[in-house]
């Protein structure tokens, strides 16, 4: 069998309890087989088109850049069924689980978008679903908790640690260690032990493939910059992948700057982290001087993660992609501006990427084409944002 490379430069690997190694190897073997199986590829393609609603549009912002030289496009993953890019790879992994004879799906979720995607895929394909979600995230993402339960998923609040995404990941892995005979762990991002970072990327790369074709059709040239928010990093790798070999295209990942780097309340493992082992992989992460993983923080639950996928760590180290950050306040401003001027309410996660694009346009407006991956819609965030805007007298 052809094997996948478990490393991206020095990052990646499979640092898990021995008990999980056979399950990961089974997953790798099944994925490699599926990639050359016309039946699997046809079924996935049909689901992405007829059920999820691909291709998603590439929308030109008509008002945000009025009077500017820059053309700003949004890759509209917010229009995908389920409300975010998560659906792309969940359908792929759920089909793999069925091929392996698994009857149950275990998932972790932060903002609830991956949990919703897992729940909808399980409802569609007749699989049982249980989703681990930090208790703090359950509170700040109530609409998504209800959506998951409505579609038949069991949502399990996690009260350990900071009760956020990192803790949900740990609980999901723990569950899988005792149930891998019947269950598949449907990991939601390009992080974790091999082969997950590669599998998730391969199912998400359709975003960049479409975006490249669409921008070439509209403009006749490649974009100057492609920008995406980075938590674990799946939406960013999804849109970056097809442009990696195009050196003229700048790839920019935007981490959550939280309340400001100086406060320590942020989620920037690439820009302010160091190398270590966490969640089954060697990558960059936020650690204290004793090597303990520090708590991350972001207003957006989906970016509230103290590490990042190994391919992003590699892209940062080689300089192929640049990583910056946007604070909570900058993301909130972008959230408001896009809603007000274009009639599109973005997820708070995606608003981080938009915030950086708007900053670039403000300080360096020139003849350029920028694509922002609008990874999800903001319905899930309206209660959080409404509370803040009310306090600040914005609305």
Curated annotation (Swiss-Prot):
Residues carrying N6-(pyridoxal phosphate)lysine: 86
Cofactor(s) of this protein: pyridoxal 5'-phosphate
Annotated catalysed reactions: (1S,2R)-1-C-(indol-3-yl)glycerol 3-phosphate + L-serine = D-glyceraldehyde 3-phosphate + L-tryptophan + H2O
Protein name in the entry: Tryptophan synthase beta chain
NCBIfam families: trpB
Pathway noted in the entry: Amino-acid biosynthesis; L-tryptophan biosynthesis; L-tryptophan from chorismate: step 5/5
Function as written in the Swiss-Prot or TrEMBL entry: The beta subunit is responsible for the synthesis of L-tryptophan from indole and L-serine.
Source organism (scientific name): Psychromonas ingrahamii (strain DSM 17664 / CCUG 51855 / 37)
Molecular function terms, GO-annotated: tryptophan synthase activity
Top-level lineage group: Bacteria
